[in-house]
Amino acid sequence: MALPDFTMHQLLEAGVHFGHQTHRWNPKMTPYIYGQRNNIHIIDLAQTVPLLHQALKLVSDTVARGGRILFVGTKRQASEIIADAANRSAQYYVNARWLGGMLTNWKTISNSIHRLRKLDKILAAEAQGFTKKERLNLERDREKLNRALGGIKDMGSVPDLIFVIDTNKENIALQEAKRLGIPVIAIIDTNCDPDDVTHPIPGNDDASRAISLYCDLFARAALDGIARQQGAMGIDLGAQVDAPVEPVLEEVEPVLEESAVLAVSE
């Protein structure tokens, strides 16, 4: 495998360059804003491209050395996409609600995960020895725990790197990661605060197409890391990380200028 590639056309087609209405913005995002059209801020994709590539490489490198990636996205349009990306890349996710202390109080979370595993075991054995009512209660307990912790029940300990969609909604996750010194890759829209993000990627964090593109790229980067790790163990998978595609960077500004005007006017 190789580090996933992407084109400026893909970013524009997914609407990555669309920010929020100009009155809904965070002034700290000024350096990442290209301009505005029809009262909508346009994100500077000339900055998004290299930052996204660097983040993909970081994910691949982290997984290649045995690290864990936690995908976080609990908003409606991100929930299923986040879970799918994490599952197909053998990583972990939180896509329902971030529980306070999920990182900083890992011991308590681990106890809840142990309870979830125990319920899985009991119900897999058809809850022998339990009444129908007791079984229903066990199933409800498992469903509740699985919704909150199912994506991290095999994680083992806190992650080595976190990928976040919507830093405003996942603010508690960011604060816990900062407290523990866990690096964070996050998509930062024009209404976000980039200060607590170690690896910011300016981009639309609301459009489903944009979220799907990000998650697909990061899932493939994690798979590339797995291939590299296995290759280092002597399994020849032909894994190799490609260098950044320079032509993409060269064509960023002219393409952005033309596409931004056309897209916003539609």
Swiss-Prot record:
The entry's keywords: Ribonucleoprotein, Ribosomal protein
Pfam families the record matches: Ribosomal_S2 (PF00318)
Single GO term (MF): structural constituent of ribosome
Family annotation (Gene3D superfamilies): Glucose-6-phosphate isomerase like protein, domain 1, Helix hairpin bin
GO BP field: translation
Top-rank taxon, per record: Bacteria
GO cellular component: cytosolic small ribosomal subunit
InterPro entries: Ribosomal_uS2, Ribosomal_uS2_bac/mit/plastid, Ribosomal_uS2_CS, Ribosomal_uS2_flav_dom_sf
Family, as annotated: Belongs to the universal ribosomal protein uS2 family.
Protein name: Small ribosomal subunit protein uS2
Gene designation per UniProt: rpsB
